[in-house]
Structures are given as structure tokens and as C-alpha cells.
UniProtKB/Swiss-Prot annotation:
Keywords: Ribonucleoprotein, Ribosomal protein, RNA-binding, rRNA-binding. One of the primary rRNA binding proteins, it binds directly to 16S rRNA where it helps nucleate assembly of the platform of the 30S subunit by binding and bridging several RNA helices of the 16S rRNA. Gene3D superfamilies: 6.10.250.3130, S15/NS1, RNA-binding. Belongs to the universal ribosomal protein uS15 family. This is Small ribosomal subunit protein uS15. PANTHER family: RIBOSOMAL PROTEIN S15, BACTERIAL AND ORGANELLAR (PTHR23321), SMALL RIBOSOMAL SUBUNIT PROTEIN US15M (PTHR23321:SF26). It comes from the Bacteria. HAMAP family: Ribosomal_uS15_B. One of its GO terms (biological process) is translation. One of its GO terms (molecular function) is structural constituent of ribosome. InterPro entries: Ribosomal_uS15, Ribosomal_uS15_bac-type, uS15_NS1_RNA-bd_sf.
Length: 89
């Protein structure tokens, strides 16, 4: 399930360089994180929905690849993003 337009715009404005910055790595990771968090609630209710679980695993994998890329290119931006999203404990 995708996010609403308002939720997407809020994430883009919060993590992007400007209101139209949808392609930066930080925005992509933040959008994937929001979708993953939304799907986790779905799976609490629908435990046997394996078709959607495959999509969730694909999103997690894509987020991991983007985070690896960001860590390789700019460690400072990577650590800031991880702290803002609360991905590492």
C-alpha cells in the first residue's frame, strides 16, 4: 500500500533539499521507511499475507542498498539520516 499524497509531501519537505526533491537518497530512504512501518502494522493483523510480505522484503532490500550507497559516498549524511529515522539502536 502506498502512502497518501500529503504524507509523501511531508516526508519530501522534511528530508529533501527543497519541496520538489524526490530523488535524493535521504528522501528515498525516508519514504521506504514510512512504507515499511505502515506494512508492519498490516502484518500484525494479516499474518498469512505472504504476497505482501514479499513486497516488504523487496522494500527492505532496496532501503539497505540505498543506505549502503549513502554510507559509501558520504558518512556524515548517512549517520544524520540514521539518527533522524531511528533505524539503529
Amino acid at each position: 500500500m502506498s502512502l497518501s499524497t500529503e504524507a509523501t509531501a511531508k516526508i519530501v519537505s522534511e528530508f529533501g533539499r527543497d519541496a520538489n526533491d524526490t530523488g535524493s537518497t535521504e528522501v528515498q530512504v525516508a519514504l521506504l521507511t514510512a512504507q515499511i512501518n505502515h506494512l508492519q502494522g498490516h502484518f500484525a493483523e494479516h499474518k498469512k499475507d505472504h504476497h505482501s510480505r514479499r513486497g516488504l522484503l523487496r522494500m527492505v532490500s532496496q532501503r539497505r542498498k540505498l543506505l549502503d550507497y549513502l554510507k559509501r559516498k558520504d558518512v556524515a549524511r548517512y549517520t544524520r539520516l540514521i539518527e533522524r529515522l531511528g533505524l539503529r539502536r
